């Protein structure tokens, strides 16, 4: 019985194999898909006025080998050609047929120009790469800018890690740094003491400026309280400059010059100023004549004669009076020095209007 069952099973399997082989033979062989042709589309601008022009252009383009399809737009004068051919050949054929044609620039498809979506994984990878590059650049730059000095690592270690016998914490270092600090302190003290001892320059310059103005204008020095106070405060400095001897220093303000001081030279106006000047002596605009001499004044007079009238009415006789007497002139002021020959101005104006003075006013 067992042998019969085994025989039946083997027969069934053989039958199944035969059926499968028959099915395979009945199926058609697999077909290979054709390769896509390299078609190109180009747009041309052609002058098309009517349906006849349209037919003529289409006939010319379809007759060329490699042209697959031709589309014509009459309103826009536009022709699109699809095929395996260069646009230069198409333009030559149309120009020979008498049709003006130009090639238009290709408009890119919006679908092709869309940006591709970027995966977040790629973004993370790029960021990590950039961070690594920055870290390496910083490390290289810090190594170049701050090179390690020999022996600096030992001093930079914390106190717990440093050995006891290091030079950074030894007593020798304290001895070397001690005198340097002391020298700096001495220099700072000298600078502070120099600032305290130095007098203020604007206060000293105010007094000579006022005296220079008085000398230039020829007037009296204004008796201001401010100038006097400043001079009193700076009495020691004036005593050292104006009094070369060991005598007492003058701290009082200078009195204003009088009228007689103008005739004296600059060296004698004030006893406080001993310095000599090389400037020429000062003269008045109208110098006075020498003492005891008066220039004769020319007198103008008209002679009127009734018996014998003059030839011309405008004729006039001119005569000069005799030289006047010399009058002694006394002046209580200082005698003029040899350096200034000019005479002082008369203090009293009574003599100018006296009858004895020929230079006086005749009306008075």
UniProtKB/Swiss-Prot annotation:
Pfam families: HMA. Residues 134-144, 237-253 have a biased composition (Polar residues). InterPro entries: HMA_dom (IPR006121), HMA_dom_sf (IPR036163). A lipid is attached at residue 361 (S-farnesyl cysteine). Keywords: Lipoprotein, Metal-binding, Methylation, Prenylation. The keyword DNA repair does not apply. The modification Cysteine methyl ester is found at residue 361. One of its GO terms (molecular function) is metal ion binding. Residues 1-12, 111-122, 154-169, 180-198 have a biased composition (Basic and acidic residues). The keyword Metal-binding applies. SUPFAM superfamilies: HMA, heavy metal-associated domain (SSF55008). Signal peptide: none annotated. Residues 362-364 form a propeptide. Residues 39-102 form the HMA domain. Belongs to the HIPP family. Heavy-metal-binding protein. This is Heavy metal-associated isoprenylated plant protein 35. The lineage of its organism: Eukaryota, Viridiplantae, Streptophyta, Embryophyta, Tracheophyta. The gene is HIPP35.
């Amino acid at each position: 019985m067992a042998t019969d069952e085994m025989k039946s099973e083997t027969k069934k399997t053989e039958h199944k194999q035969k059926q499968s082989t028959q099915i395979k033979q009945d199926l058609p062989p697999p077909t290979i898909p054709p390769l896509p042709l390299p078609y190109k589309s180009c747009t041309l601008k052609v002058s098309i006025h009517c349906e006849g022009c349209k037919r003529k252009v289409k006939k010319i383009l379809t007759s060329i080998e490699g042209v697959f399809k031709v589309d014509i737009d009459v309103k826009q004068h536009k022709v699109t050609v699809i095929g395996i051919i260069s646009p230069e050949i198409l333009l030559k054929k149309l120009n020979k047929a008498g049709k003006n044609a130009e090639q238009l620039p290709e408009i890119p498809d919006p679908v092709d120009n869309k940006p591709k979506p970027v995966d977040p994984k790629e973004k993370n990878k790029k960021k990590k790469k950039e961070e690594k590059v920055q870290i390496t650049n910083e490390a290289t730059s810090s190594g170049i800018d701050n090179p390690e000095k020999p022996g600096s690592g030992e001093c930079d270690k914390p106190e717990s890690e440093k050995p006891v016998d290091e030079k950074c914490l030894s007593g020798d270092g304290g001895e070397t740094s001690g005198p340097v600090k002391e020298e700096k302190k001495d220099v700072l003290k000298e600078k502070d003491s120099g600032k305290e001892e130095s007098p203020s320059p604007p206060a000293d310059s105010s007094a000579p400026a006022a005296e220079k103005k008085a000398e230039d204008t020829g007037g009296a020095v204004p008796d201001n309280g401010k100038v006097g106070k400043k001079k009193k405060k700076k009495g020691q400095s004036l005593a050292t400059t104006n009094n070369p001897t060991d005598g007492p220093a003058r701290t009082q303000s200078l009195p204003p010059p009088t009228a007689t001081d103008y005739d004296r030279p600059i060296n004698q106006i004030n006893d406080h100023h001993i310095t000599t000047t090389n400037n020429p002596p000062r003269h008045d605009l109208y110098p006075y004549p020498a003492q005891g001499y008066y220039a004769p004044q020319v007198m103008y007079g008209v002679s009127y004669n009734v018996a014998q009238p003059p030839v011309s009415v405008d004729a006039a006789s001119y005569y000069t009076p005799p030289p006047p007497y010399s009058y002694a002139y006394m002046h209580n002021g200082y005698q003029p020095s040899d350096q200034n020959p000019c005479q002082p101005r008369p203090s009293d104006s009574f003599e100018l209007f006296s009858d004895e003075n020929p230079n006086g006013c005749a009306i008075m």
